[in-house]
From Swiss-Prot:
InterPro entries in the cross-refs: Ribosomal_uL6-like, Ribosomal_uL6-like_a/b-dom_sf, Ribosomal_uL6_a/b-dom, Ribosomal_uL6_bac-type, Ribosomal_uL6_CS
Summary of subunit composition and partner proteins: Part of the 50S ribosomal subunit.
Role: This protein binds to the 23S rRNA, and is important in its secondary structure. It is located near the subunit interface in the base of the L7/L12 stalk, and near the tRNA binding site of the peptidyltransferase center.
Alphabetized GO MF terms: rRNA binding; structural constituent of ribosome
Protein name stated in the entry: Large ribosomal subunit protein uL6
Name of the coding gene: rplF
Entry keywords, A to Z: Ribonucleoprotein, Ribosomal protein, RNA-binding, rRNA-binding
Length: 177
């Protein structure tokens, strides 16, 4: 039995929730997010709270209810406060710039990299070696950050590459003669 699913999600003021069958839509100051809920989960909306319970006949109903609760809680946080992800560029000549919804990266290749940002995601560069991604959808923020990191992952000898701001890169010792 899921302990996560037993805790209700509190809906703050200024957030509008629409439940239409198995499709839930949450709207706030940062936009609107929509998700389809698994048929094994029953969601009730009352008193500015979302409560979750499994439906009969599904073996993994409590597990899916806990997962659904965590996803919808992330949606509520996203439309109220939003999510941020910070990336750092470590290496000589590694630079980033943002023009509109395109991130321009110079990562030591013979060509610059232009990465198109999806709708709902904004990026800014406080310095040439930092990228800050902002948006309401936690999953898309993480995917964009992973895509940018995949262009030049941190290598284990000098640590050069694109890394998350909170990432610790374990460096290896160079080969001895």
């Amino acid at each position: 039995m899921s302990r996560v699913a037993k805790a209700p999600v509190v809906i703050p003021a200024g957030v509008e929730v629409k439940l239409n069958g198995q499709v839930i839509s949450i709207k706030g100051k940062n936009g609107e997010l929509t998700r389809t809920i698994h048929e094994a989960v029953d969601v009730q909306h009352a008193d500015n709270q979302l409560s979750f319970a499994p439906r009969e006949g599904h073996a993994n109903g409590w597990a899916l209810a806990g997962t659904t609760r965590a996803l919808l809680n992330g949606m509520v946080i996203g439309v109220t406060d939003g999510f941020t992800k910070k990336l750092q560029l470590v290496g000589v000549g590694y630079r980033a710039a943002v023009k509109g919804n395109v991130v321009n990266l110079s990562l030591g290749f013979s060509h610059p990299i232009d990465h198109q940002l999806p709708a709902g995601i904004t990026a800014e560069c406080p310095s040439q070696t930092e990228i800050v991604l902002k948006g309401a959808d936690k999953q898309i923020i993480g995917q964009v950050a992973a895509d940018l990191r995949a262009y030049r992952r941190p290598e284990p000898y000098k640590g050069k590459g694109v890394r998350y701001a909170d990432e610790v890169v374990r460096t290896k010792e160079a080969k001895k003669k």
